[in-house]
Design a protein with these regions (language model features):
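Acidic/polar, glycine-enriched structural segments that form the non-catalytic walls/loops
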Residues: 1-181
Length: 181
């Protein structure tokens, strides 16, 4: 996979009847738990509830970062996200990012002026890795470096690489469906 640890999301906002400040808020929610019968009626097994302990949660500039460890297997996950704002085809570099960190949630917020009909784009890069792939000392630096690389590559390159990868994948895939003809 071209960049198996990276996911990219692009949000476009175009004010139709408004000129003024547009705010973007991005959250990293660490308050996750296994589904129960209440939250998913097809689930009928345990263990229920929160089984991932938070080891680190932080927000710095446009970066969110989290590490957590499962209670029973002690597998760990590290993830983060980075953000860029684009207007008129140019990345907006001198934005002020405000951040807050709670016990199980962190967020970053920024804003930018936009005119009616002007499109503003938020590019959000997300990176995940686990203790199955990297040791504890390597995970944080890996996530932060991958996020930086993804921001440098940008959405268009990442999308191009993913399309090329998927085209090669499906070219080599040998899928036959029989029955119900």
């Amino acid at each position: 996979i071209a960049r198996k640890n990276i996911m990219a999301i692009e949000y476009e906002v175009t004010p139709m009847n408004y000129s003024g400040r547009i705010e973007f808020m991005s959250k990293l929610q660490a308050d996750v738990e296994n589904h129960t019968r209440k939250t998913n009626p097809i689930v009928d097994y345990g263990p229920f509830g929160r089984k991932l302990d938070s080891d680190e949660l932080r927000a710095d500039g446009d970066i969110l970062y989290y590490e957590g460890t499962t209670q029973n297997s002690h597998l760990s996950v590290a993830c983060g996200s980075s953000h860029g704002i684009w207007k008129d085809g140019a990345e907006q570099k001198n934005l002020e990012w405000k951040s807050s960190v709670g016990e199980l949630e962190a967020e970053v917020v920024t804003g930018i002026q936009a005119e009616k009909g002007e499109t503003v784009v938020l590019e959000k890069m997300i990176c995940y890795t686990t203790s199955l792939d990297l040791g504890k000392e390597e995970r944080k630096s890996f996530v932060l470096a991958e996020l930086e690389r993804a921001q440098e590559d940008g959405m268009q390159k990442l999308e191009k690489w993913q399309k090329e990868y998927m085209a090669k994948f499906w070219e080599a895939a040998d899928v036959e469906i029989k029955g119900n003809e």
